[in-house]
Amino acid sequence: MKLKLYLIPLLASGIILSACSSTTSQVISSLSSAQKYFEANKGELNKNNVINILKDGYNSDPNKTVNALLAGWKYTLMDQKLLENNLDPSRFKNTFGPNKNKDDVTPNISEKGLFLNETFTGLGSQIAEVFNVQKQIVSGFSYSWTSPKSFKVNIHIKMEGMINEKSKETIKSFLSNKDSNGSNSVEESEYTGDKAKFTADFIFSYTPPTGGTRSLTDKSFDVITNMINFPADVKIDVNTSHNKLNELLEKNDQVKRMKSRTFNGRNIDLLPFFYYALL
């Protein structure tokens, strides 16, 4: 009955409003409270209802609502280890969609997740090959929110990579290129044995959007598209433990652009992460 009342388009009764406010306050008070609520009311757990409840919550208490959303993002990445563990296909499909994969998780270290084709037109796949990601771990996730104009989210992903024949040739090619400012060191010893293994640190920072992008509003909670768009500028910083990769990041005119990049006015869909935390 509570779900039916909530989905009535025109709320004419003060009793109905009271019931909805009670549901909303439980869901937005904390992620654990939302999990307990939907565990006890499984019939109400669907994307449209979750979006409507969160939209109502944003209009009544935006700080609690956004903090609950960010907690869901953190929980799904760090506690559920979405990037590290093998995917539960059914759960992932229910949250992210039938045609999505790990490359669609935000953030992640991949050609798509790093926006490589936007920085390196026609070279995105080659840059991704250089890193040859074997494993990535979300090792840090911090956030603070005051308003759509004042917030910051920092996500630290540690990556383990391995130089293989393909990535070795790509690195050599970049190092031999004139854009590397005369650096053409391609000694085999730099790419074999333990030296073929390396780590990298990627820091993803999310701050209020610039460039004319609209900030978060109640219209960001969209039941038509089944999305909760969180507008932000995204900054990506990277460093690695591999001498030759660092050489590229420091000296190669193309690759060094990857060391620190900013993308203005991006929309991060937070619904899949919050919804994943509820299943």
UniProtKB/Swiss-Prot annotation:
Membrane topology: Lipid-anchor
Ion transport among keywords: no
Residues anchoring lipid (N-palmitoyl cysteine): 20
InterPro entries in the record: Lipoprotein_3 (IPR001595)
Residues carrying lipid (S-diacylglycerol cysteine): 20
Cellular compartment(s): Cell membrane
Coiled-coil spans in chain: none
Gene Ontology CC: one annotated term: plasma membrane
Signal peptide interval: 1-19
Keywords of the record: Cell membrane, Lipoprotein, Membrane, Palmitate, Signal
Family: Belongs to the MG439/MG440 family.
Designated name of the protein: Uncharacterized lipoprotein MG439 homolog 4
